[in-house]
Swiss-Prot record:
<comment type="subunit">
    <text>Part of the 30S ribosomal subunit. Interacts with proteins S7 and S18. Binds to IF-3.</text>
</comment>
<dbReference type="GO" id="GO:0003735">
    <property type="term" value="F:structural constituent of ribosome"/>
</dbReference>
<dbReference type="InterPro" id="IPR001971">
    <property type="entry name" value="Ribosomal_uS11"/>
</dbReference>
<dbReference type="InterPro" id="IPR018102">
    <property type="entry name" value="Ribosomal_uS11_CS"/>
</dbReference>
<comment type="function">
    <text>Located on the platform of the 30S subunit, it bridges several disparate RNA helices of the 16S rRNA. Forms part of the Shine-Dalgarno cleft in the 70S ribosome.</text>
</comment>
<keyword id="KW-0687">Ribonucleoprotein</keyword>
<protein>
    <recommendedName>
        <fullName>Small ribosomal subunit protein uS11</fullName>
    </recommendedName>
</protein>
<dbReference type="InterPro" id="IPR019981">
    <property type="entry name" value="Ribosomal_uS11_bac-type"/>
</dbReference>
<dbReference type="GO" id="GO:0005840">
    <property type="term" value="C:ribosome"/>
</dbReference>
<dbReference type="GO" id="GO:0019843">
    <property type="term" value="F:rRNA binding"/>
</dbReference>
<dbReference type="GO" id="GO:1990904">
    <property type="term" value="C:ribonucleoprotein complex"/>
</dbReference>
<keyword id="KW-0689">Ribosomal protein</keyword>
<keyword id="KW-0699">rRNA-binding</keyword>
<dbReference type="Pfam" id="PF00411">
    <property type="entry name" value="Ribosomal_S11"/>
</dbReference>
<dbReference type="InterPro" id="IPR036967">
    <property type="entry name" value="Ribosomal_uS11_sf"/>
</dbReference>
<keyword id="KW-0694">RNA-binding</keyword>
<dbReference type="GO" id="GO:0006412">
    <property type="term" value="P:translation"/>
</dbReference>
Length: 129
């Protein structure tokens, strides 16, 4: 039982003006994370967590919904400007950026940070359908 004299402090939301949107677009899913400049996560959303399952997870519309959810959750911190870092070859790259722009953020920079191997791991075998 809590002591009657102790009070817990109310958690103060920090205000962040500039943020970074990390979009990881794989062939199966899209993950959108919005952080501050130091890399501390403010909000995140995924296509799978937005209610899409199976092959619908990897559609541009699912990436758009995930970006809208992450953008609306990050709006509580007072974000105005976003740098966008896009990683991966997935189908949700473009639509996630457009959805963040539609949320009212000023996108200052778009950077592709897809890791490119210098002939590293062997790629998966080609599909035969």
């Amino acid at each position: 039982m809590a002591k009657p004299g102790t009070r817990t402090r109310k958690k103060v939301k920090k205000t962040v003006v500039d943020g970074v949107a990390h979009i990881h677009a794989s062939f199966n899913n899209t993950i959108v994370t919005i952080t501050d400049r130091q890399g501390n996560a403010l909000s995140w959303a995924t296509s799978g967590g937005s209610g899409f399952r199976g092959s619908r997870k990897s559609t541009p519309f699912a990436a758009q919904v995930a970006a809208e959810r992450a953008g609306n959750a990050a709006a509580e911190y007072g974000l105005k400007n976003l740098d966008v870092l896009v990683k991966g070859p997935g189908p949700g790259r473009e639509s996630a950026i457009r959805a963040l722009n539609a949320c009212g953020y000023k996108i200052t920079n778009i950077t592709d940070v897809t890791p490119i191997p210098h002939n590293g791991c062997r790629p998966p075998k080609k599909r035969r359908v």
